[in-house]
């Protein structure tokens, strides 16, 4: 269960970082 939570958190963080990169490159 803990591992699933960590995976979900990692996914959320990764998506957030990707969105920030997209904003820098193409604008939001």
From Swiss-Prot:
Tissue and organ distribution: Expressed by the skin glands.
Presence of keyword Metal-binding: no
Top-rank taxon, per record: Eukaryota
InterPro entries: Antimicrobial_frog_2
Disulfide bond positions: 23-28
Single Gene Ontology BP annotation: defense response to Gram-positive bacterium
UniProt keyword list: Amphibian defense peptide, Antibiotic, Antimicrobial, Disulfide bond, Inflammatory response, Mast cell degranulation, Secreted
Principal place of residence: secreted
Assigned GO CC terms: extracellular region
One protein family per Pfam: Antimicrobial_2
Subcellular location: Secreted
Entry's family note: Belongs to the frog skin active peptide (FSAP) family. Ranatuerin subfamily.
Role description: Mast cell degranulating peptide. Causes histamine release from rat peritoneal mast cells in vitro. Has antibacterial activity against the Gram-negative bacterium E.coli K12 and Gram-positive bacterium M.luteus NCT C2665.
Record-given protein name: Ranatuerin-2SEb
Native organism: Lithobates sevosus (Dusky gopher frog)
């Amino acid at each position: 269960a803990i591992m699933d939570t960590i995976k979900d958190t990692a996914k959320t963080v990764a998506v957030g970082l990707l969105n920030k990169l997209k904003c820098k490159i193409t604008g939001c």
